Amino acid sequence: MSAASTAEGTWRTWIDTPVRWAGAAAGVAVGALVDFSPEPDVQLLYAFPAFGLCVMAGVLAADLVARPRHSWIRVAEVTPRRVRDHVPRALAAFLAAQAAILTVLVVIAARTASADSKGRPGRALAVECPAGSQLLGPWPGLYYAWPALGGTALGTVACALLLRRVTLRSQTHDQRRIQARAAVGAWGVLVTAPLFAVSFTMAVVVLSLSCAGAAKVFALTALTLTAFTSALSGCHCLGVLLLPQAYTEARS
């Protein structure tokens, strides 16, 4: 008996998906029950990254709880395993592009951010219009956007470690692909959730501008499309990790 066939018989699939659901439910509860800021408009910028971290924690917990219990009989495999052979490349590339967009938006927001009406730096957008100056917020400068960048960086490290564990583990190729897809899905939530929060918050501020003309229309269109795409991507990633069997059957 090979190590892969032994692991297949001891993988506790009955607990894997429920633990992932528990992580997502914890993320929803944290966002709904925890007041990250006394300013209601800022809640979105903190709650969405927190949700993504809870989802990733659920996937990590599921991997620890449901991982195979190896038998004392082990057979070495000659074929080398590589992480890229198990990762859904199209999804990973699409999510990497969104992570780059998130970084660009945060950099733009940080460079254009100003102090708010209370003199606190990096929390508002100051604009000079013919009718007068405007001070709009919240604007996702570094003060508000650090949870998005920090959560994405932390989740990227966790995803890389989990993918390595999955690749080196003794189990069938299909099981590795399912586990790797779930890890990428969790990372996708960590990317798309803050991307939606940042792009949506910026779009609301841009919509409130009383000037800017064509530049306003272009920026608003780009931010709206980004928020919409990130929302769809986030829902897809949740489906990948919360409904793995349905996704596998649809792909087969």
Positions of PLM-derived features:
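N-terminal membrane-targeting/anchoring modules of bacterial envelope and secretion proteins
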Residues: 1-117
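Generic serine detector
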Residues: 2-5, 37, 71, 114-117, ...
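Hydrophobic core of alpha-helical transmembrane segments in multi-pass integral membrane proteins
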Residues: 28-32, 51-61, 101-104, 148-161, ...
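Membrane interfacial helix motifs at helix-loop boundaries and amphipathic/re-entrant anchors
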Residues: 30-50, 106-148, 200-225
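Generic multipass alpha-helical transmembrane bundles of integral membrane proteins
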Residues: 64-181, 187-194
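C-terminal transmembrane-bundle signature of multipass membrane proteins
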Residues: 154-166, 175-252
